[in-house]
C-alpha cells in the first residue's frame, strides 16, 4: 500500500465534478449548504444531547440564529432540484416567513431561558420563560401544518424536520423544568403526553413522505438510479438522521446525556456522479446497480481490500476487488467477501489496509471508454483513500495509480468545518461493491464506533446490529426509517445475537438495561452475560400481526434490577422465549443506564407514584380503573415495598396506604367467594369446589398471594376440576361480566363461563421456570423470604389476552380474561354463572391465581340484542325440556315405585329382581339436564328429581343385596366366594358376567350360612346349550336336597317369572345374627345380612364422580354416577325358582351339568318373610 501525504491541503469544496445534473435548466450543486448545516446539527444533537441552556443555545446557534431567509430557500431548493418539482410562490413565501418567525420567537425564548437559568428563584424570570415557552409552543403547533401542505410534502420535508426538532426540544424543556417554572404537575404531564404523541407523529410523517417519494422515483435505468440514490442519501442526511434522535427528547426516559449511534449506510458512486451524461445515453440497467447495495446485515468495519487492475484501449482501470471486515469490538471471526468485478492481472494487486479511524475521504478518477472497436468501460483509473488520524496532520493516504478530482466529501460533507476534514469528517468507508467495473462506496456515520463502549455518566445506546454473532433463526431486516439503521427480527424462540460490550472503564458502576423493541406477541426477553443471567422478564406485544412498523410500534422494555460488569470485555447474549407461534419480535437497540443510588431512588419513587396513581379513576382514589387487575395491584404493591426507606420513607408509607386501599376496592368488586384460595371444599354451600388433587400454595416470585396448582389426569372422563357459582343475587340484569386472572403456566387448561350456554377457551401459557434463576442477585432474603424486588413483569392493560364476543385470541399471555353477558335476572331460578376450570389430559397442568369476576359494563346496542336473543332461545328450549322431563319423570317414577311394597320405600316387592331394578334405573337416566355436560359434578335444572329417584334406586339395590344370602351371585366379581372343581370360567356376554361350565366333570359350589326353620326361595337364571341337563342343587349335610334343572328344549323364561308361591320378603326381617364370612374354602365370603348401604358388593355408589346424560351424544364419557346400562336377557335364558326350608344353619349351592355347556346368569337365595 502506498502511503501519500500530498494533496491533503486541497479543500473539498475546491474540487468539483465536470458533469452536473441539470433539472429545469438549473444545476444540482454537489456542495449544497443544507447538507453541511444538517451534518453540523446532527453532530450537535449526538454529542450534546443534554437538557439545559447549553443545548438550546447551541440549537439556536446552529440553525435558528444562523440561517437567513435566503438560507431557508436553499433547504427548499435542495429537494426541489432532486425531484424536479417547484413549490408554488405563495407556499414558499409562507413557509419561509413562518420559519423566520419561529427563529425570532426562539431567540426570545433562549434569552428568557438563560435569564431564568442564572436566577432560578426570580419570579419575573420564571414568568418570562413560561410566557415565552407558551408563545413559541403555540406558534409551532399552529404553523407546522404549513410545512406539510398536500402536494408539497416532499420539497418541504427538510424544513418540516427542522421545525419538528425545535418543537420537541422546547417540549422537553417544559417537561424537565416546567414545575420549577411554576407549571402544575397536571400541566407538565399534559405537555409530556403531547410530546410523546408528537414524537410519533413527526417521525411517521417524515418517514412516510420519504418512502413514498423514493418509491415514486424508482431506478429502472442507471441514470434514474443516480437520482434515486442521491435522494436517498441526502434525505437520510437532512431528515432521517435527525428523526432518529427524536425519541431521545423524551425527558422522562432520557433525563441525562444520551450517547446514540447511527448504523445506517449511505452510498456514493463516482462513476455515476461523474459520467452522468454517458450513462444516461447508454441507459444501463439501474436494477443491476441497486443489487450491488448490501442487504441488511450486522454492522462490520472495513479492514483490508485487494484491488485488481485490467487494461482496455490504452487505459489501466480498477476491475475488481476482494475485501475483509471485522465486527464491532473485533469480536468473532474476520469477514471475507467474495470477489466483486473481475480479477484483472494487468498490474500487480494493490492492497489497502484500514488505519486508525478508517477511510474518511476518497478522490476518484473515473473514466468512460466508448464502445468503439472494443468493449465499453465505465470505471475508475485511479483512487486515493485518505485515513482519519487525529494525531497526524496531514493524515496518510493509500493511492491506487493516479487519484482524481471526484471528491466523496462533495456528496458527504464534513460535520465540522472549523477543523481540517480528517478531524471534522462525518462518515467512514465501510464497504465497496462493483457494478461491472464501476465501484460503489458504502459509508457509515462516524458516531457508530468500532467498540460498544459503556460510559459511566451517560445513557449508552447500542444498536442491536452492532453484535458479532447472529444466531440461527434471527435475521437482520431493513430499518423502518426512524431507527437510524437496520434492526433485528425473530419469529421463533431462541438466541438472537451476541454482542461484545467494552466495560473496561466502568467495572464498579451499576447499570440498568433497557431495550427498544416492537412485537406482535408477548414473549420473554432474556439478557445473559456469558453463562450467567443478567435479567429476564415478560414483554408485552406492541402491535398486531400484519401491521406496518410505525414509530409508536416501538417501546422500551426495562429491567429494574441494576447489575455490575465483572470483566472488561463482556459478551452479552440476547434471547427470546415463550413467543407464540406466528409472533414477530423486532429489536432496535439496547441501552445501559447508570444506576446512581440517589437517582435510582428518585426514579423508583417516580415510577411507584405513577403506578399507584394509575390504579384509580381520579385523584381522590374513590374507584379503581376497570382495566386494573388484581394481579397488577399486587405488582404495584411490590413496587412500593421495594422503595428505599433511607431516601423516601414517608412517601413509601403514603403510597402503601393507597395500594392497600386499592386492594380493598379490588376485593369489594370481585364477585368470587374466597378469591385468595383459603380453602377448597371447605364449605358445602359456598366458595370453591374441586378435585382432591388440587393444591393451594403460598405466594412465590410470581404470585404475592395464594395460588392453586391443577395437575393432569390419567382419565379424561375423570378430569381435574375447580369451580364456583356466582349467585344470581350478585348479578345485574343486562350487564357484561369479566372473568380474569393470571396464569403462571398451563397446558390444556379449559376455562368455562356457563349461564345460558358455555363460553369456553383452552389456555396454553408457556412457563418461565428456567428463567427465574437468571438474575445475579439472590431470589431470597436472609431468612429465606422471597425477594420481590427482583425484576417483575411489567403490566400493560392494552395487550392483555382478552377473548370477547367471538374474537380470536392468542392464549399465550399470562394475563387472561373471558367475558359473559347476563340478561334478565330471576332470584327464584337462581341461574347464576358457573366459573369452571378443567384439565382432562395427562399432560395438562396449570398454576393460576388472582382470579376475579367483576362487572364490566352495561349492555347496549348489538350486545344487548344478542343476549336477549340468546335468553329467548334458552327459555324456549327449557320449556320443551320441561314437557319432556315431565313425561320421562312420570314413567321413571312409576317403574321405581313398582319395585317397592309401599311409599315408605323400605321393602321390595317379592317378585322384584335385579333386571327390574336395572330397567327402572335406565328409565331414571333418561332424565335430561341433570348435570352440566361441561363438568358432571355441577347440578343441572333436573338434578333434584334425578337424585330423588336415583336414591330410591340405590335403596332398591341395597335391599336386594341384603335379602340375597349368596355372595357374588351375579358373578360380577368373577369366582370370588365360589369353590371350583374342574375347568369353569366367567365370561362377558351382552355386557353381563355369566358363569360358563363347559364340561360335565366341572362343578361350582358355595357354602352358605342360613337360619334353620326359615323359608328361602332359590331363583336361578340360566341357559343350556346342547344335550343333557344343567343342575343347580341346594342341600344340607343330611339329605334335604332340592334342585333346579335346565334343558335346551325348554321354553324361554324371563326375570319376571312368578311362581305364585312367594310372599313379601323384606330385608328388615333378615337374620343378621346368622351372618358369617367365607371360610377357608370360600375365600372372600362376606356378611350376607349386612344392613349398611355402603356394604353393597355389586352396586357402585359413585355419586361424587360423574353423571350420565344421553343428550350429549358427542361425549364418549358416560357420566353414569354408578349407572350401568344393563341390557335385557338374550333369547334362551330361563328363570326358575323353588322354595327351601333348611333344618340346619348351613346349606350348599352346587352348580353342574351332565353334558354340553351350562351358562348361569345369576343365582339368588332369598329369605322369606315370617
Swiss-Prot record:
Keywords: Sporulation, Toxin, Virulence. SUPFAM superfamilies: delta-Endotoxin (insectocide), middle domain, delta-Endotoxin (insectocide), N-terminal domain, Galactose-binding domain-like. One of its GO terms (biological process) is sporulation resulting in formation of a cellular spore. Gene3D superfamilies: Galactose-binding domain-like, Pesticidal crystal protein, central domain, Pesticidal crystal protein, N-terminal domain. GO terms for molecular function: signaling receptor binding; toxin activity. InterPro entries: Cry1Ac-like_dom-VII, Cry_V, Galactose-bd-like_sf, Pest_crys, Pest_crys_Cry1Aa_dom-IV, Pest_crys_dom-III, Pest_crys_dom_I, Pest_crys_N_sf. Belongs to the delta endotoxin family. Toxic segment of the protein is located in the N-terminus. Promotes colloidosmotic lysis by binding to the midgut epithelial cells of many lepidopteran larvae. Toxic to Plutella xylostella. This is Pesticidal crystal protein Cry1Jb. It comes from Bacillus thuringiensis. The gene is cry1Jb.
Amino acid at each position: 500500500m502506498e502511503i501519500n501525504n500530498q494533496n491533503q491541503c486541497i479543500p473539498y469544496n475546491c474540487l468539483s465534478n465536470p458533469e452536473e445534473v441539470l433539472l429545469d435548466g438549473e444545476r444540482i450543486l454537489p456542495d449544497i449548504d443544507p447538507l453541511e448545516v444538517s451534518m453540523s446539527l446532527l453532530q450537535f444533537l449526538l454529542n450534546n444531547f443534554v437538557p439545559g441552556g447549553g443545548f438550546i443555545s447551541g440549537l439556536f446557534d446552529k440553525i435558528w440564529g444562523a440561517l437567513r431567509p435566503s438560507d431557508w430557500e436553499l433547504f427548499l431548493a435542495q429537494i426541489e432540484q432532486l425531484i424536479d418539482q417547484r413549490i408554488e410562490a405563495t407556499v414558499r413565501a409562507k413557509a419561509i416567513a413562518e420559519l423566520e418567525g419561529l427563529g425570532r420567537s426562539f431567540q426570545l425564548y433562549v434569552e428568557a431561558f438563560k435569564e431564568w437559568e442564572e436566577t432560578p428563584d426570580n419570579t419575573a424570570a420564571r414568568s418570562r420563560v413560561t410566557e415565552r415557552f407558551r408563545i413559541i409552543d403555540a406558534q409551532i403547533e399552529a404553523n407546522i401544518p404549513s410545512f406539510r401542505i398536500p402536494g408539497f410534502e416532499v420539497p418541504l420535508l427538510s424544513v418540516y424536520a427542522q421545525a419538528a426538532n425545535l418543537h420537541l426540544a422546547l417540549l422537553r424543556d417544559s417537561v424537565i423544568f416546567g414545575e420549577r417554572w411554576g407549571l402544575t404537575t397536571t400541566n407538565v404531564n399534559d405537555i409530556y403526553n403531547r410530546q410523546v404523541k408528537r414524537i410519533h407523529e413527526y417521525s411517521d410523517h417524515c418517514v412516510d413522505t420519504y418512502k413514498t417519494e423514493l418509491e415514486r422515483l424508482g431506478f429502472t435505468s442507471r441514470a434514474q438510479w443516480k437520482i434515486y440514490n442521491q435522494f436517498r442519501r441526502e434525505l437520510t442526511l437532512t431528515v432521517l438522521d435527525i428523526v432518529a434522535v427524536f425519541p431521545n427528547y423524551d425527558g422522562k426516559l432520557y433525563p441525562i446525556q444520551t450517547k446514540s449511534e447511527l448504523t445506517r449506510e449511505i452510498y456514493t458512486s463516482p462513476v455515476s456522479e461523474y459520467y452522468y451524461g454517458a450513462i444516461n445515453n447508454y441507459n444501463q440497467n439501474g436494477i443491476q446497480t441497486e443489487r450491488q447495495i448490501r442487504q441488511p446485515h450486522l454492522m462490520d468495519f472495513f479492514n483490508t481490500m485487494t484491488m485488481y487492475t485490467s487494461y482496455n484501449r490504452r487505459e489501466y482501470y480498477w476491475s475488481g476487488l476482494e475485501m475483509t471486515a471485522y465486527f464491532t469490538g473485533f469480536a468473532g471471526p474476520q469477514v471475507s467477501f467474495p470477489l466483486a468485478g473481475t480479477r484483472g492481472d494487468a498490474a500487480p494487486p494493490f492492497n489497502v489496509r484500514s488505519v486508525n479511524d478508517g477511510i474518511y475521504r476518497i478522490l476518484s478518477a473515473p473514466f468512460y471508454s466508448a464502445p468503439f472497436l472494443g468493449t465499453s468501460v465505465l470505471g475508475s483509473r485511479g483512487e486515493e483513500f485518505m485515513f482519519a488520524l487525529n494525531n497526524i496532520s496531514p493524515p496518510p493516504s493509500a493511492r491506487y495509480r493516479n487519484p482524481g478530482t471526484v471528491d466523496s466529501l462533495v456528496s458527504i460533507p464534513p460535520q465540522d468545518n472549523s477543523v481540517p476534514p480528517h478531524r471534522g469528517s462525518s462518515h467512514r468507508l465501510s464497504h465497496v461493491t462493483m457494478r461491472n467495473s464501476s465501484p460503489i462506496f458504502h459509508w457509515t456515520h462516524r458516531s457508530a464506533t468500532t467498540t460498544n463502549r459503556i460510559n459511566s455518566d451517560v445513557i449508552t445506546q447500542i444498536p442491536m446490529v452492532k453484535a458479532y454473532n447472529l444466531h440461527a433463526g434471527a435475521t437482520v431486516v431493513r430499518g423502518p426509517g426512524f431507527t437510524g439503521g437496520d434492526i433485528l427480527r425473530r419469529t421463533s424462540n431462541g438466541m438472537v445475537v451476541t454482542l461484545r460490550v467494552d466495560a473496561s472503564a466502568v467495572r464498579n458502576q451499576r447499570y440498568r438495561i433497557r431495550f427498544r423493541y416492537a412485537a406482535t406477541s408477548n414473549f420473554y426477553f432474556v439478557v445473559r452475560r456469558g453463562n450467567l443471567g443478567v435479567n429476564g422478564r415478560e414483554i408485552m406485544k406492541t402491535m398486531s400481526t400484519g401491521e406496518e412498523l410505525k414509530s409508536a410500534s416501538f417501546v422500551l422494555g426495562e429491567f429494574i434490577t441494576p447489575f455490575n460488569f465483572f470483566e472488561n470485555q463482556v459478551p452479552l447474549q440476547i434471547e427470546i422465549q415463550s413467543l407464540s407461534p406466528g409472533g414477530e419480535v423486532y429489536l432496535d437497540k439496547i441501552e445501559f443506564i447508570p444506576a446512581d443510588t440517589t437517582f435510582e431512588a428518585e426514579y423508583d419513587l417516580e415510577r411507584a407514584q405513577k403506578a399507584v396513581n394509575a390504579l384509580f379513576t381520579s385523584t381522590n382514589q374513590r374507584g379503581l380503573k376497570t382495566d386494573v387487575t388484581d394481579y397488577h395491584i399486587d405488582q404495584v404493591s411490590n413496587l412500593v415495598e421495594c422503595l428505599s426507606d433511607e431516601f423516601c420513607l414517608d412517601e413509601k408509607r403514603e403510597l402503601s396506604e393507597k395500594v392497600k386501599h386499592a386492594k380493598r376496592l379490588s376485593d369489594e368488586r370481585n364477585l368470587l367467594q374466597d378469591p385468595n384460595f383459603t380453602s377448597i371444599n371447605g364449605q358445602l354451600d359456598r366458595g370453591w369446589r374441586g378435585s382432591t388433587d388440587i393444591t393451594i400454595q403460598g405466594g412465590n416470585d410470581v404470585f404475592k398471594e395464594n395460588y392453586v396448582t391443577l395437575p393432569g389426569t390419567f382419565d379424561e372422563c375423570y378430569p381435574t376440576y375447580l369451580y364456583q357459582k356466582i349467585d344470581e343475587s350478585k348479578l345485574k340484569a343486562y350487564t357484561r361480566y369479566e372473568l380474569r386472572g393470571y396464569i403462571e403456566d398451563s397446558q390444556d387448561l379449559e376455562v368455562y363461563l356457563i349461564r345460558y350456554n358455555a363460553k369456553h377457551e383452552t389456555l396454553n401459557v408457556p412457563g418461565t421456570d428456567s428463567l427465574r434463576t437468571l438474575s445475579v442477585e439472590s431470589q431470597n432474603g436472609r431468612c429465606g423470604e422471597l425477594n420481590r424486588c427482583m425484576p417483575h413483569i411489567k403490566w400493560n392493560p392494552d395487550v392483555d389476552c382478552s377473548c370477547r364476543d367471538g374474537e380470536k385470541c392468542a392464549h399465550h399471555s399470562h394475563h387472561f380474561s373471558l367475558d359473559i353477558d347476563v340478561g334478565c335476572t330471576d332470584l327464584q331460578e337462581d341461574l347464576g354463572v358457573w366459573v369452571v376450570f378443567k384439565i382432562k389430559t395427562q399432560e395438562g397442568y396449570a398454576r393460576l391465581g388472582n382470579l376475579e369476576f367483576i362487572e364490566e359494563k352495561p349492555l347496549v346496542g348489538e350486545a344487548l340484542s344478542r343476549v336477549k336473543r340468546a335468553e329467548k332461545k334458552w327459555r324456549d328450549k327449557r320449556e320443551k325440556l320441561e314437557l319432556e322431563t315431565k313425561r320421562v319423570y312420570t314413567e321413571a317414577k312409576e317403574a321405581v315405585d313398582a319395585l317397592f311394597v309401599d311409599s315408605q320405600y323400605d321393602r321390595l316387592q317379592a317378585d322384584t329382581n335385579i333386571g327390574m331394578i336395572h330397567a327402572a334405573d335406565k328409565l331414571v337416566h333418561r332424565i335430561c339436564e341433570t348435570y352440566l355436560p361441561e363438568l358432571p359434578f355441577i347440578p343441572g335444572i333436573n338434578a333434584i328429581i334425578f337424585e330423588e329417584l336415583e336414591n330410591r334406586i340405590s335403596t332398591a339395590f341395597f335391599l336386594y343385596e341384603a335379602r340375597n344370602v349368596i355372595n357374588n351371585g351375579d358373578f360380577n366379581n368373577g369366582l370370588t366366594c365360589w369353590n371350583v372343581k374342574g375347568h369353569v370360567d366367567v365370561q362377558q356376554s351382552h355386557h353381563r358376567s355369566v358363569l360358563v361350565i363347559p364340561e360335565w366333570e366341572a362343578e361350582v359350589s358355595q357354602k352358605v350360612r342360613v337360619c334353620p326353620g326359615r323359608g328361602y326361595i332359590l331363583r336361578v337364571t340360566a341357559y343350556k346349550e346342547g344335550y343333557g341337563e344343567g343342575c343347580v342343587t341346594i342341600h344340607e349335610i343330611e339329605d334335604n336336597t332340592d334342585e333346579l334343572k335346565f334343558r335346551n328344549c325348554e321354553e324361554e323364561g324371563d326375570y319376571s317369572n312368578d311362581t305364585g308361591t312367594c310372599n313379601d320378603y323384606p330385608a328388615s326381617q333378615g337374620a343378621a345374627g346368622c351372618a358369617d364370612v367365607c371360610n377357608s374354602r370360600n375365600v372372600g365370603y362376606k356378611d350376607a345380612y349386612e344392613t349398611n348401604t355402603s356394604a353393597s358388593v355389586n352396586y357402585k355408589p359413585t355419586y361424587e364422580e360423574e353423571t350420565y346424560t344421553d343428550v350429549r351424544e358427542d361425549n364418549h364419557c358416560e357420566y353414569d354416577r354408578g349407572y350401568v346400562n344393563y341390557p335385557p336377557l338374550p333369547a334362551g335364558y330361563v328363570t326358575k325358582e323353588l322354595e327351601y326350608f333348611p333344618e340346619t344353619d348351613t346349606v350348599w349351592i352346587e352348580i353342574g351339568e351332565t353334558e354340553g355347556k351350562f351358562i348361569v346368569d345369576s343365582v339368588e337365595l332369598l329369605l322369606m318373610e315370617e
